[in-house]
Amino acid sequence: MLNQFSRTQLLLGKEAMDRLKGARVAVFGIGGVGGYVCEALVRSGVGAIDLIDDDKVCLTNLNRQIIATRKTIGKYKTDVMEERIHDINPDVIVVTHRCFFLPENADEFPFEEYDYIVDAVDTVTAKIALVMKAQEKNVPIISSMGAGNKLDASAFKVADIYKTSMCPLAKVMRRELKKRGVKKLKVVYSEEKPTRPIEDMSISCRSNCICPPGAEHKCTERRDIPGSLAFVPSVAGLIIAGEVVQDIAFDRV
């Protein structure tokens, strides 16, 4: 019978669609990358998704985040994404976690119930903790490396973390994961050399914070605020979603 996933099923097949419908994917970080991951997963037929983020939509998110509009400024990203998901497919089971993932709260998440984990968080500490937890629970994970300060969306690659180059975040992750005995990690990274952002305090979040009320205003604590574009993190997110969908659909993990 014709349905909203009929065109997808023409490529993947009925058995693959059943796998996707029965899968539960956790997306950590619902920002420039993570938002597009969620969008593509839901449009591809994933049946259950966990959304993990404690941030609110900010005016500065409008340039790149799929959940950011004038109407959603000030709303929690998890709430906006949940509403968007149900507008696309009301049958998706959505579990929201209004918090940032940290080593301290890692045990609060039902990792045993996840079929796949997407790491789209910003900090190295959280990324490492998430990778370690996924490894401990034997859950497949894919991690997003740096998408800020990049101009060339065609430079993204899928690779093992130990085969990456150029990306400063990937370099730190390689070092830290090697220390912890992690043998492999699928990542999406850019081979493009980062562009140094223009130093202009008049448009810097560090000195002109406009975070919504109730937000943690962490931008004022950051050493550097990366530049970003609509067509770069979105592509990274779609590539990640493609890997997750194919891994689940074709039982590659």
Identify the function of each model-found stretch.
Residues M1-A26:
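N-terminal charged helix/coil linker that caps or initiates catalytic domains
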Residues L2, E112-E113, A126, E136, ...:
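Glycine-rich phosphate/adenylate-binding loop
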Residues V27-G29, I52:
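Conserved N-terminal Rossmann-fold NAD(P)-binding element of oxidoreductases
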Residues V33-G34:
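Hydrophobic/small residue at the entry helix of a nucleotide-binding pocket
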Residues V46, L51-N89:
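Glycine-rich phosphate-binding loop and adjoining beta1-alpha1-beta2 segment
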Residues R98-A106:
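Conserved SAM/SAH-binding loop
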Residues A120-V121, S144:
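Short, well-ordered coil/turn residues at beta-beta hairpins
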